[in-house]
Structures are given as C-alpha cells and as structure tokens.
Amino acid sequence: MAEKRNIFLVGPMGAGKSTIGRHLAQLLHLEFHDSDHEIEQRTGADIAWVFDVEGEEGFRRREAQVIADLSEKQGIVLATGGGSVQSKDIRNHLSARGIVVYLETTIDKQVARTQRDKRRPLLQVDDPREVLENLAETRNPLYEEIADVIVKTDEQSAKIVANQIIEQLGF
C-alpha cells in the first residue's frame, strides 16, 4: 500500500466498528480513530452528557466537525458514529477522502451486543429493538449509498472481519 489511504467504517451501533477498526488499523499499520471517542476527548464529557445538554442536534454538529477534521488526515482507520451518515456533508467527506466499508449486522445481533451498554443515549428507552428497527430503516440505505465494500459482521470474530476487509480491498 504505497499511498496511505483512509478507511472509514460505517454501520449501525453494535456492528463492531470500533473493535474491528482497531484490529484493521493494527494489521495495516495505520492510526485508529473513533469519532465518538474523539468527541468525548474534545468536550471532556461522555456522549450521553453531550446528548443531554446539547440534544442530538448539538451532538451531530460536533460529530460533523470531528469527522471533517479526522478525514483530512492520511493513513487512518476511522470508526464513525452510527448516525453520522444522516449528514450529506459527512457522506460526501467520507466518499471523497477514503474507502468506505459498511459493517452490516442484523437487528438481533445489535440488540444482543448493545443491551447492557448504558452509553448509547438513543437506546435508553423501553423498547430498544423498535428504535434499532426504525434507525435501520432510515440509515441502512445511506450506508449502502456510500459503501465501497459491504461486510457482514454477525457470525465472525472482529479479527476475521478485519482480515476479510483487507482481502476485499486487495491490501
């Protein structure tokens, strides 16, 4: 890989973007970044606090700035937030500045992977499955729209998925 290409991971919460991203970056000797973690670093607060104080709109503004900044770098793997693709500007940034990999997963797997995670503000409701179904309906077409590669993450370990991505990208 002569040119340092960026790899942007998109997909719903619970797809494994952060875990797979770390493995992928390590295997390819690239920097790993997580947009949610970067927001927390910049604000000095967790995502739930940002949602509580600034609402989803404030969070999305911060997310757009973080992704714009990070996507300017070269040679990174970036795990994006599940809702980041709702912004046309973010979709354009990602498409123009690297390879977009959509990590696809089922609602059942999302529920299993996120059920005990209290750091996901959108799922702190009585019926998280319904929320995930509604999000999938609006977001999945957006993930597909910008994806250069689609990889299913349900039945594989993060290491195996990272290797599948490398294989599909021809690295």
UniProtKB/Swiss-Prot annotation:
One of its GO terms (molecular function) is magnesium ion binding. The keyword Acyltransferase does not apply. It is found in: Cytoplasm. GO terms for biological process: amino acid biosynthetic process; aromatic amino acid family biosynthetic process; chorismate biosynthetic process. It catalyses: shikimate + ATP = 3-phosphoshikimate + ADP + H(+). Its EC number is 2.7.1.71. ATP binds at G14, A15, G16, K17, S18, T19, R120, Q156. Pfam families: SKI. PROSITE patterns: SHIKIMATE_KINASE. One of its GO terms (cellular component) is cytosol. Gene3D superfamilies: P-loop containing nucleotide triphosphate hydrolases. InterPro entries: P-loop_NTPase (IPR027417), Shikimate/glucono_kinase (IPR031322), Shikimate_kinase/TSH1 (IPR000623), Shikimate_kinase_CS (IPR023000). Pathway: Metabolic intermediate biosynthesis; chorismate biosynthesis; chorismate from D-erythrose 4-phosphate and phosphoenolpyruvate: step 5/7. Its cofactor is Mg(2+). Its main location: cytoplasm. Binds 1 Mg(2+) ion per subunit. Mg(2+) binds at S18. It comes from the Bacteria. Catalyzes the specific phosphorylation of the 3-hydroxyl group of shikimic acid using ATP as a cosubstrate. Belongs to the shikimate kinase family. Monomer. This is Shikimate kinase.
